[in-house]
Amino acid sequence: MKEKRTNVRWMFALAFFFIGVIAYMDRANISYIAKQMMDDLGMTKPQFGLLASFFSLGYALMQVPSGMLAEKFGPRKMITIALVWWSAFTILTGMIKNHGLIYLVRFLFGVGEAPMYPSNAVFNSFWFSKNEKGRASSALLAGSYFGPVLAPIVTIAIVNAFNWQAVFYIFGAVGILMAVLWAIIAKDLPEQHRMVNEAEKRFIMENRDIVATEKSSPPWNDFFKRFSFYAIAIQYFVVQFIITLFLIWLPTYLTEVFHVNFKEMSISSLPWLLMFFLILSAGAISGRVLGLGRSKFVARGVIAIAGFIVFAVSIIFAVRTGNLYVSIFWLSLGLGGIGISMGMSWAAATDLGRNFSGTVSGWMNLWGNIGALISPLLAGLFVEHLGWTMTFQLLIVPAVIAVIMWFYVKPDQPLIVSDDKAIEK
């Protein structure tokens, strides 16, 4: 009788979903206690926006190094260290009162979260088949944007029961517990895991998209000769610029434009809830399209382009209504579109990078987080001088640029064809 294949790899996809939930709850909670923090610490809007910018600076600077470290030391060690590190600095955020120190803490918090996505890319390259990578990547992404769905509910409950500082203490403790669990259950390769039977191991090893299990140094000179290496970074700059703007400023927008109070702020979770569902759906659809024999450009690029177009159209309608619920509907649809594009970005990064997926995804996420670094501060300045409507409408311009870039990403042409040689230009 043919041995039935185990599905241990999907257990790890679920684990990454929960890691994503924790990471983005830790990131998003600060936006729901913005007023309390600004009042207690005497911060202006631009100063508060700098907290997110310092996080993004630390996060961005460590993207490429963390991807290379994940390739060298394995995602098991990197994820464990990352969870403990960022959870410790989450806890410290609630303890610091000095402006300069809290900026430093948020910078180091960003350093700690940096290895999460590149390590996931390395893990997926070795644990999943070519056709499964889009769906596997969507698990962490879906968790990341289910985090903001839970964040307002949990944050508001903690603040009502204790104070805003307790939010950081409790969230940080959960992250440390997750680090312990991950260290116990995870292995870098399916060949190393005793729960993976021979049928699953054989399926993975025959169908994964890597050129060799042995690691070698990334051929940076060859990478820099390919415009697809720049294109995937530019479009992801746009993705994270837009997402971070809404992650930080959406609650404040709803308060100032629609007079939503703190107790009603859970409505701001709806855009992230739709993003969660669309990320999962896009990953599944992308895998199905590949299974039908279509190109990776169709399975990744066309879906990503559709996501940006949905965002651009939705944002126009979102700012031209005086009705809170209509605005939330269009904002939800728009952010859902960006979520689709984000999911395809990570799938395409593993397509391009293959066994250097940690490096390529780290490069992509570096530029994404440069966008995230400047977005909160720039948005704070634009809102003060131009207002919310014009600030949101201006986001259509980078969305159009991102659409153009996707025609140059070319996920069907990987950067690596052997262990030490990049493909010709």
Task: Enumerate the predicted regions with their spans.
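Extracytoplasmic gate region of multi-pass secondary transporters
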Residues: 30-31, 226-280, 342, 346
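Extracytoplasmic
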Residues: 11-45, 246-251
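Cytoplasmic helix-loop-helix junction between adjacent transmembrane helices
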Residues: 105-144
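Conserved MFS/SLC helix-loop-helix module at the cytosolic interface between two early adjacent transmembrane helices
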Residues: 61-97
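C-terminal transmembrane helical hairpin of 12-TM major facilitator-type secondary transporters
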Residues: 297-344
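Helix-breaking motifs and short loop linkers at transmembrane-helix boundaries and internal kinks
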Residues: 42, 74, 89, 95-101, ...
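Structural signature of the two symmetry-related core transmembrane helices
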Residues: 77-91, 298-315, 396
